[in-house]
A protein has these predicted regions:
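Catalytic cores of the polymerase beta-like nucleotidyltransferase superfamily
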Residues: 1-441
Length: 441
């Protein structure tokens, strides 16, 4: 098998080999090349020790000497070159306390997580595949190298990585590996929220975000997102739905594009339903105010998982308003844009579309027609530059002060009153007209 590798990476391999060392590109870049994907980075492994690597190249950065890693700079790119190593005992299910350098490529590959990530390649030796990674790629399987219980015990984050790779590649997790996931899922409590967040986002941004179901079935989500588990067991006995809340969420994820805010919003949009669910005397379920409850829960979840404030702001606002259904009249849509926010309204439209597509077919045509009218009205508002917030109101606080108003709460209240006038009739968004309205009072 011949793989195409970047010229700079090939140069590094050649220099190391010419100096008498073994050297290979390794891991994810080999996997992605075999799959016909463009690797994000090209990592190299070598029998040379870090100081020997540094002696061979003019420009290097000490990125992880304790783990045997030196970054070699070639032109404007950096390539991580790591010495063959054997990992010692892992600390708190995260990182090895110490590593031991080895002269054996096999020993180095043996410590890696999955067979598809445990292959090495160089142009002269070809593909080195000691654990069946190529066959597992062909069979579309995620399998641990060696004993999966050992691999997951070494670093519990590999539990999340197994599901994430499955979702990214559309692969099935091999049976013994899957069993080990279930046994060791509780070890995720030893993994930092930041590391879990990174893997969750990668899973959600993958071509198969609904593979979160695999994480649920293995008991993984119970460790960091128990609110989702509650959704999976919450039925929706209503004509509008044909799935449990959780299954509806999983289906909705597949109906939005791979945007971080959108995917996280779909994950959390109905997270409040289990806590507000009421069943009437006819056995029909109701979920009144689930957007409000969901907004609060989403904020708690996102903070717990250490998301940034901008993501929290956007997602919680979309969760709050996701079920808001203005009629298609332009006036109602102007008010909705004002409520939800100019920056978030396009997202809101995508959220509503995905939410609807993950429901039953009940009144689907009617729902789609209403949403299409809202989209049309929104286009009109944008194209005509209609005022939907204080930002584009023709009168400012400064204008009111000049008109004799005192700085303070009265100015804010007056501006909001004028905005209400303009939301009802955008033609009145003219300074003279608005100030004239004040004179009438």
């Amino acid at each position: 098998m011949i793989l195409e590798i970047p010229k700079n990476a090939e140069t590094i391999l050649h220099i190391l080999e010419k100096a008498g060392y073994e050297a290979y590109v390794v891991g994810g870049c080999v996997r992605d090349s075999i799959l016909g994907r463009s690797p994000d980075a090209w990592d190299l492994t070598t029998s040379a020790k870090p100081e020997q690597v540094k002696a061979l190249f003019h420009r290097t950065v000490d990125t992880g000497l304790q783990h045997g890693t030196v970054t070699v700079l070639m032109e404007k790119e950096g390539y991580e070159v790591t010495t063959y190593r054997v990992d010692g005992e892992y600390e708190a299910g995260r990182h090895p306390k110490e590593v031991t350098f080895t002269a054996s490529l096999k020993e180095d590959l043996k410590r890696r997580d999955f067979t598809i990530n445990a292959m090495a390649y160089n142009p002269s030796s070809g593909l080195v595949d000691l654990f069946g990674g190529l066959e597992d790629i062909e069979r579309k399987i995620i399998r641990c190298v060696g004993d999966p219980l050992e691999r997951f015990t070494e670093d519990a984050l590999r539990i999340m990585r197994a599901v994430r790779f499955s979702a990214q590649l559309g692969f099935t997790i091999e049976e013994e590996t899957r069993k080990a996931l279930k046994v060791l899922a509780p070890n995720l409590q030893h993994v930092s929220a930041e590391r879990i967040q990174v893997e969750l986002v990668k899973l959600l941004m993958s071509p198969h975000p609904d593979y979160l179901r695999v994480a649920y079935e293995a008991g993984i989500t119970a460790e960091f997102l128990p609110e989702f588990d509650a959704c999976m067991t919450t039925s929706q006995n209503t004509p509008h739905h044909c799935y449990t809340v959780g299954e509806h969420i999983l289906h909705s994820l597949c109906h939005v594009r791979a945007d971080k805010v959108l995917r996280i919003t779909m994950l959390l949009h109905d997270i409040g339903k289990p806590v507000v669910r009421k069943t009437d005397e006819n056995g029909r379920d109701h979920f009144k105010m689930h957007g409000i409850a969901g907004e609060k829960m989403a904020a708690q979840i996102l903070r717990r998982l250490k998301f940034d404030n901008d993501t929290i702001r956007k997602v919680t606002r979309l969760v709050k308003w996701h079920d808001d259904r203005p009629e298609g009249m332009t006036k109602a849509v102007r008010r909705a844009v004002n409520r939800i926010g100019e920056d978030l309204f396009p997202y809101y439209l995508e959220v509503q579309q995905a939410d609807m597509l993950a429901q039953s077919d009940y009144r689907r045509t009617e729902k789609q027609e209403r949403l299409d009218k809202v989209k049309e009205a929104y286009e009109t508002i944008i194209n005509e530059h209609q005022c939907v917030s204080l930002k584009t109101l023709a009168v400012t606080g400064k204008d009111l002060i000049e008109a004799g108003y005192k700085p303070g709460r009265e100015i804010g209240e007056t501006l909001n009153r004028l905005l209400e006038v303009v939301l009802a009739d955008p033609q009145k968004n003219q300074k003279e007209i608005l100030l004239g309205l004040l004179d009438e009072k």
